[in-house]
């Protein structure tokens, strides 16, 4: 089974896909088609009554796509929209809603704007063979409330009567990051999750609601995860409220500098502050600590004895890392045996903390001595052409050096 991902990681991937030319509309089409394919691989859907219970978000959009594909295969398809069509939240979901609105012959649409007409859903579910949960997905927040909670109860009653329940991506009512039940949740027979399972699906708390877990490919390029893109930036941006205080917007730790280089870690710290971080803490040898401080009073310097990164520096860095949101390792460290051993030791110990790392400059060269240390890190590696060759043994063509 694929390892799980968080909601935030999936958001990053979606944004990066769009940047690479794989639009959200394409991803939605693939997701809905895969749901239909999963159903058709288990049932002969011709003349089966399939009720798709959708809400106004992107999970609803996936359901609209699935409805279209299932109708083309001869199923009796009913789409029940819980909510007002005018409040469908995204362009992609609205586009697919508009499509099924034109399919009046093959798809029956029912609109339940509020709890007062929940009888319409109950009637639609009464003789359903298959029910598709397209209500709430990764955007769920807090305990379910009416009319969604009432819809979930009716879906579970349909299951008790023998209907087969399929949840798209994650059963409605399950927290995608923790697996906790948010008051109540759909009890699915099959959950068709996109790209990779959301980590909540893999928890014991969610196991009796997930049913069979099927992970499907929706066309996410490898590059959307392998390389940093706009999504990796957007996910870090927070609304800056008037009530915010120091530390709310990031504490960045820079481990760099040596007797030879004092400017590189200072510039990294200034760049962190310029990018919006609240605090930039630099762990550096004592011999250059005052030089770094001279760049700006906003830089916090933690110093250790020695001229290059050593065991004392690693110990200090690990202590500072406990409170850091992200850690930059490398600028100005120099490339010496003592530094290489210290860098490898530091990264190895940070791997188990799940801290976000940036491996830069001389730290990249150090990692070339033992590339296994980079396995399973959460981070970004920032080589220029020369460092890329040292790390991988691959020489980039001249036109790609920049």
Question: What residues fall within each predicted segment?
Answer:
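Small/polar-residue-rich loop-to-helix segments that shape phosphate-bearing ligand pockets
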Residues: 97, 112, 128-136, 324-332
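Small-residue (G/A/S/T)-rich helix-start motifs and N-terminal tracts that mark the onset
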Residues: 1-83, 89-90, 94, 201-361, ...
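Glycine-rich phosphate-binding loop signature in dinucleotide/nucleotide-binding domains
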Residues: 42-46, 124-129, 160-162, 321-323
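Gly/Ser-rich phosphate-binding catalytic loop and adjacent alpha/beta segment
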Residues: 65-128
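Amphipathic alpha-helical segments in well-structured domains
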Residues: 93, 97, 148-152, 188, ...
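Phosphate/ribose-phosphate-bearing ligand recognition and processing surfaces
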Residues: 61, 86, 140, 144
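YjeF_N-associated NAD(P)HX repair module
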Residues: 2-5, 125-262
């Amino acid at each position: 089974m694929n390892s799980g991902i968080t909601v935030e990681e999936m958001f990053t991937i979606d944004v990066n896909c769009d940047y690479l030319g794989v639009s959200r509309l394409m991803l939605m089409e693939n997701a809905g088609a895969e749901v239909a394919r999963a159903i058709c691989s288990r049932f002969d859907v011709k003349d089966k009554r399939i009720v798709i219970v959708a809400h106004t978000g992107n999970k609803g959009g996936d359901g609209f796509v699935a409805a279209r594909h299932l109708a083309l295969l001869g199923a009796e398809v009913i789409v029940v929209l819980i909510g007002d069509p005018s409040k469908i939240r995204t362009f992609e979901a609205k586009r697919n809603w508009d499509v099924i609105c034109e399919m009046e012959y093959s798809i029956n649409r029912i609109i339940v704007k509020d709890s007062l007409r929940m009888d319409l859903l109950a009637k639609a579910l009464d003789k359903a063979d298959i029910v598709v949960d397209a209500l709430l997905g990764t955007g769920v927040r807090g305990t379910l409330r009416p009319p969604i909670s009432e819809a979930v109860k009716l879906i579970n009653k349909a299951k008790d009567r023998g209907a087969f329940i399929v949840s798209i991506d994650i059963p409605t009512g399950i927290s995608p990051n923790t697996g906790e039940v948010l008051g109540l949740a759909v009890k699915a027979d099959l959950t068709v999750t996109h790209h990779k399972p959301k980590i909540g699906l893999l928890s014991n708390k969610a196991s009796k609601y997930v049913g069979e877990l099927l992970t499907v490919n929706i066309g996410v390029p490898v590059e959307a995860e392998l390389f940093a893109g706009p999504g990796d930036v957007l996910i870090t941006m927070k609304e800056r409220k008037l009530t915010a205080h120091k530390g709310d917007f990031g504490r960045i730790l820079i481990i760099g500098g040596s007797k030879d280089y004092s400017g590189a870690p200072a510039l990294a710290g200034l760049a962190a502050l310029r990018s919006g971080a609240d605090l930039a803490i630099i762990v550096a040898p004592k011999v250059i600590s005052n030089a770094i401080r001279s760049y700006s009073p906003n830089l916090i310097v933690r110093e250790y004895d020695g001229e290059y990164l050593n065991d004392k520096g690693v110990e200090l860095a690990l202590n500072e890392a406990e409170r850091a949101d992200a850690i930059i390792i490398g600028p100005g460290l120099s490339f010496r045996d003592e530094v290489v051993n210290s860098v490898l030791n530091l990264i190895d110990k940070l791997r188990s903390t799940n801290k976000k790392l940036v491996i830069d400059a001389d730290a990249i060269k150090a990692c070339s001595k033992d590339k296994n240390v980079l396995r399973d890190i959460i981070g970004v590696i920032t080589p220029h052409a020369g460092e890329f060759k040292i790390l991988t043994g691959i020489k980039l063509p001249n036109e790609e050096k920049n």
